Amino acid sequence: MGKPIVAIVGRPNVGKSTLFNKLAGKRISIVQDTPGVTRDRVYAEAEWLNYNFTMIDTGGIEPTNDDIIMKQMRRQANIAIETADVIVFIVDGKEGLTAADQEVANMLRKSKKPVVLVVNKIDSLKYEENSWEFYNLGIGDPITISASQALGLGDMLDKVVEHFDRFDADAEDDEYIRIAMIGKPNVGKSSLINKLLGEERLIVSDVAGTTRDAIDSYLETEQGKFILIDTAGLRRKSKVKEEIERYSVIRTYASIEKADVCILMIDAQDGVTEQDEKIIGYAHELNKAIMVLVNKWDLVEKDDKTMEKFKKDLQGSLKFMPYAEYLFISALTGQRTHKILELAKKCYNNYNKRVSTGILNDVISQAILMKEPPIVSLKRMKIYYATQVATKPPKFVFFVNDASASHFSYERYLENQLRNSFDFKGTGIQIEYRQRKE
């Protein structure tokens, strides 16, 4: 299961972006932040009190017309309800309670999702009593903050992480392999999911999320137990294309975060697009197991070398993830679709693989004998031993004399040795150097 997702929701100009940027400004321990598909930063990886979580800013465009504001607020609330594990609902302590706040609070209350009510712009104690009227929203005790001055953020985050125990305890689905089918619209994701569900007779259930758009399908096959995570985009039309794109990014990111295996589906006639690269880039950065499905292969004119050439071109476009598995299919005709779950299971097994310390160090010792680390800044890194410290993805720690003497080319060499020895096809692996005195 991925990290808990925390979504920030609120009216325009209440301080959503200020709060998000303050939290992403390394005033709490931000592990990593990555730009989204749009120019706006959509999410950031964060840590508080040893809890790792993902923040999502539902912000987007800030309208001025009251009717448009209300429509946008509903969309924000829906996307937060659909994707988040905890919702931070931010209101304006200086402006006071509004009808828009009331309506969104009603939506959040009905969703049964944990909500942390935050009253912003309480810049001094004299404004503290401004928070009292927000008790009327009926979604718990308001927490007062000043996002711009970073006041009260610790109390807010304490309240947020209180809800994570419930999230961590919900492990009933741990025996299932979570698969996110990702890709641009109209590439055939829905057709493929329907085919997989239609061909498998042991479907356990279809569990609908909090909105009609979020449906995860549970199925059992000879290969194992799987959850197919729906990554459908917004189906309603909107004049504001940028806003729709932002919500689509949030949906896709949330699906990837929750997945073990991410399957990028591309159109054989289009090849890899910039949008494809950005979408699968999320999965790569989050170190998920990755497969690439080339759909509509039945429509391509080909000879016995076409597939090999096509795959080579794809690997050139996606060279940042050379470990990915590839499969050429037709969701329409069913060509090779029976191999998808089998390959997904293989990727998952490698993603979850553990190597014994003894065998690992035999491989590393042999690798060092064949090629010793280079000299960097007049120093040569000495590797004492290595151990695997995690799975999903496999993470290896190398204890060395001087971590600053490491070189990326040698790290790549070590990674290749690990891959050749232990078959980590379909998953990223992580390498970390830790300094140890001789």
Swiss-Prot record:
The gene is der. It comes from the Bacteria. It holds the Pfam family KH_dom-like. GTPase that plays an essential role in the late steps of ribosome biogenesis. This is GTPase Der. InterPro entries: G_ENGA, GTP-bd, GTPase_Der, KH_dom-like, KH_dom-like_a/b, P-loop_NTPase, Small_GTP-bd. Associates with the 50S ribosomal subunit. GTP 1 binds at residues 10-17, 57-61, 120-123. GTP 2 binds at residues 183-190, 230-234, 295-298. Keywords: GTP-binding, Nucleotide-binding, Repeat, Ribosome biogenesis. GO terms for biological process: ribosome biogenesis. The keyword Nucleotide-binding applies.
